[in-house]
Amino acid sequence: LEKPKYRCPACRVPYCSVACFRKHKEQCNPETRPVEKKIRSALPTKTVKPVENKDDDDSIADFLNSDEEEDRVSLQNLKNLGESATLRSLLLNPHLRQLMVNLDQGEDKAKLMRAYMQEPLFVEFADCCLGIVEPSQNEES
């Protein structure tokens, strides 16, 4: 087994590849981490009032600081994602773009991710991203 590099968006269980994620999502239970949920819900939430001329830099910084180092994509891999012709081609699809907007703006992102991972177009997009980020991982399915 490889060291897990990713976490399930629903239950935060670590997984190492697309194949492992597919196996996991069949039996995923978002309530597998109730203690962590209770702790997080007990913590005070930070509210940020929108300010004019304020970029998304703060929210990006919060996001980057929110997860463990192992969950982050390297700058080189981000660059590779941006330069991928296949990924750019997929992102021209208006349906995929709408799914991405809905996911970005949605309240329950884990629920949306579970639903979208049933959509072949979104799975193709996710597989493409993972293939770029983890080029050494060959699909086992």
From Swiss-Prot:
GO biological process: box C/D snoRNP assembly; maturation of LSU-rRNA from tricistronic rRNA transcript (SSU-rRNA, 5.8S rRNA, LSU-rRNA); snoRNA localization
Residues that coordinate or bind Zn(2+): 8, 11, 24, 28
Protein name: Zinc finger HIT domain-containing protein 3
Gene: ZNHIT3
Keywords noted in UniProt: Cytoplasm, Metal-binding, Nucleus, Phosphoprotein, Zinc, Zinc-finger
Main location, first listed in the record: cytoplasm
Zinc finger intervals, HIT-type: 1-28
Modified residues (Phosphoserine): 66
Subcellular location, record wording: Cytoplasm; Nucleus
Gene Ontology CC terms, in alphabetical order: cytoplasm; nucleus; pre-snoRNP complex
Single Gene Ontology MF annotation: zinc ion binding
InterPro entries found in the cross-reference section: BCD1, Znf_HIT, ZNHIT3_C
Subunit structure: Thyroid receptor interacting proteins (TRIPs) specifically interact with the ligand binding domain of the thyroid receptor (TR). Requires the presence of thyroid hormone for its interaction. Interacts with NUFIP1. Interacts (via HIT-type zinc finger) with the RUVBL1/RUVBL2 complex in the presence of ADP.
